[in-house]
Swiss-Prot record:
Family: Belongs to the RmuC family.
Coiled coil: 32-126
Organism of derivation: Rickettsia felis (strain ATCC VR-1525 / URRWXCal2) (Rickettsia azadi)
Gene from which the chain derives: rmuC
InterPro entries: DNA_recombination_RmuC (IPR003798)
Record key words, sorted: Coiled coil, DNA recombination
GO biological process, one term: DNA recombination
Name under which the protein is recorded: DNA recombination protein RmuC homolog
PANTHER family: DNA RECOMBINATION PROTEIN RMUC
Pfam families: RmuC
General function of this protein: Involved in DNA recombination.
Length: 428
């Protein structure tokens, strides 16, 4: 039937697979059996070798046993001899030890007496030093307590001073002055501290610092502080009110207009003014921003820039660079004039060197002419006189004077072209 063919084929395949599996297993078992046979043979050989080694070890053990018995007998004999000698030595040492004990006891008594006396002396000395040091320590502790009490009073006074409006303001002014002094700017030239001026309506203004920038620019710094910046308690509301009052006061003072008017009267022309509100610490800036997040925006709208020590140092560094560059540009004409004088002095030196060279040339030429005349005329007559029998004595006559000549040549100027020569524009 047709459906039996697949079943038969499947059965044949399964049977074939079983035959292959059985064949593979048979081969595997044969291989394992052969391997085990080889291992068994190797183990048998190893057992024979081990038996031979065992026999050899037993023989060595017997030999060592005999040696041990002999050594034990020898040890027993030596112990017996040692006991006898020890007994005789013990009797002799007993007598000697008795005498030594008496002597050592006497020496020990003497040493104990000396040690006791020395110890008592050292204890007395140490006790005296300890008492004196203890008294000094008590005195120092008393003085330290007084100093601590005084320091506590001073700290309280400083804290109260900083918590007062005047003390906080002085702290900001002192910090500002120290930063300006360490910035490298020149006092009374690049900046002025505590500049007082009178407004048009006879009012008094006193900015903490003025910094004169190039190109008619002016930087005004006014330090502001509050006791709430120093106080550790959370006074965000009071701090915000105080700093906004300072900002309003600074904006109403109108520093820019009044300072420009005052300085222009003194023939100092300034066009632009930048106003800085200086706070004594970076933490103070963070406290103000935390108390009033819109404080910076309010200040910027009034053309006032709140800064701490770090921000002020950055602006002062840039200001110093501008001032130095402007000073260098102002000294440009002076530098040109000094270079012109230097070139003129170089020309004068060249004239003098030319004259010295001419004089040297004339001197050497005249000397050469003198040497030629001396060698040709004078020395020939001296030789003739010497041939006539007149001796010069101990002095040897010179053979001839050396002659010198100067070779003059025009110096050549070597020009080297630069890779990137600077372009110089001539100004008429």
């Amino acid at each position: 039937m047709p459906y039996l063919l697949p079943i038969t084929a499947a059965a044949l395949l399964i049977l074939l697979a079983l035959i292959i599996w059985f064949y593979v297993k048979t081969k595997t078992f044969k291989t394992q059996l052969q391997f085990l046979s080889e291992q068994n043979l190797e183990i048998s050989n190893n057992n024979q070798l081990l038996n031979q080694e065992k026999i050899g070890c037993l023989q060595k053990i017997e030999q060592l046993k005999c040696k041990v018995e002999y050594q034990e007998q020898t040890i027993k004999d030596s112990e017996k001899i040692r006991e006898e000698s020890f007994s005789s030595a013990k009797a002799a040492l007993f007598d000697l030890g008795k005498d030594l004990s008496k002597q050592l006891i006497e020496i020990h008594k003497m040493e104990n007496n000396a040690a006791r006396e020395l110890a008592e002396k050292n204890i007395a000395t140490a006790s005296g030093k300890f008492n004196s040091e203890f008294e000094r320590l008590i005195t120092m502790v008393g003085a330290l307590n007084k100093d601590i009490e005084q320091s506590k009073g001073t700290v309280d006074l400083i804290k109260q001073s900083l918590l007062s409006p005047i003390g906080a303001g002085l702290l900001a002014e002192i910090t500002l002055e120290n930063i300006l002094k360490s910035s490298g700017l020149r006092p009374n030239l690049d900046f002025i501290m505590q500049y007082g001026l009178t407004t048009t309506d006879s009012g008094k203004l006193r900015p903490d610092a003025l910094i004169f920038l190039p190109s008619g620019n002016l930087m005004v710094i006014d330090s502001k502080a509050s006791k709430f910046l120093v106080d550790e308690q959370d006074n965000s509301g009071n701090l915000s009110k105080t700093m906004n009052y300072h900002l309003k006061s600074l904006a109403n003072k109108d520093y820019a207009e009044n300072i420009l008017t005052n300085l222009n009267k003194k023939d100092q022309n300034f066009n632009n003014v930048i106003t800085l509100m200086f706070l004594p610490t970076e933490q103070a800036v963070e406290k103000v921003i935390a108390a009033d997040p819109e404080f910076l925006q309010k200040a910027w709208s009034c053309n006032i820039f709140p800064v701490g020590p770090a921000g002020l140092m950055n602006m002062l560094s840039f200001a110093k660079f501008q001032i130095t560059d402007h000073r260098r540009s102002e000294n440009y004409k002076v530098i040109i004039e000094e270079v012109r004088k230097l070139l003129s002095s170089i020309g004068t030196m060249a004239d003098y060197s030319q004259k010295i060279g001419n004089n040297l040339h004339n001197m050497v030429t005249n000397y050469d002419k003198f040497a030629a005349s001396f060698n040709r005329n004078f020395m020939s007559r001296v030789k003739n006189i010497h041939k006539l029998g007149i001796d010069s004595g101990n002095k040897a006559m010179p053979a001839a004077l050396e002659r010198y000549q100067i070779v003059s040549s025009k110096s050549e100027i070597i020009e080297v072209e630069a890779e990137n020569p600077p372009q110089i524009e001539e100004k008429l």
